[in-house]
Amino acid sequence: MASEIFGTAAIFWVLIPAGLLGGALLLKLQGE
């Protein structure tokens, strides 16, 4: 059970920053 929670948390720790960076890149591309 604990390993599942840790695995899910790890996925979010990767996806959230990746999503923020991806959104920033899209805004920069649209701005140009």
Curated annotation (Swiss-Prot):
Assembly with partners or alone: The 4 large subunits of the cytochrome b6-f complex are cytochrome b6, subunit IV (17 kDa polypeptide, PetD), cytochrome f and the Rieske protein, while the 4 small subunits are PetG, PetL, PetM and PetN. The complex functions as a dimer.
Family matches, as Pfam families: PetM
GO cellular component terms attached to this protein's record: cytochrome b6f complex; plasma membrane-derived thylakoid membrane
Organism whose genome encodes this protein: Prochlorococcus marinus (strain SARG / CCMP1375 / SS120)
Xref: HAMAP family: Cytb6_f_PetM
UniProt keyword terms in alphabetical order: Electron transport, Membrane, Photosynthesis, Thylakoid, Transmembrane, Transmembrane helix, Transport
Name by which UniProt lists this protein: Cytochrome b6-f complex subunit 7
Coiled-coil regions, chain positions: none
Membrane-protein topology: Single-pass membrane protein
UniProt function note: Component of the cytochrome b6-f complex, which mediates electron transfer between photosystem II (PSII) and photosystem I (PSI), cyclic electron flow around PSI, and state transitions.
Subcellular location(s) of the protein: Cellular thylakoid membrane
Domain of life: Bacteria
GO biological process, one term: photosynthesis
Family: Belongs to the PetM family.
TM stretches of this protein: 5-25
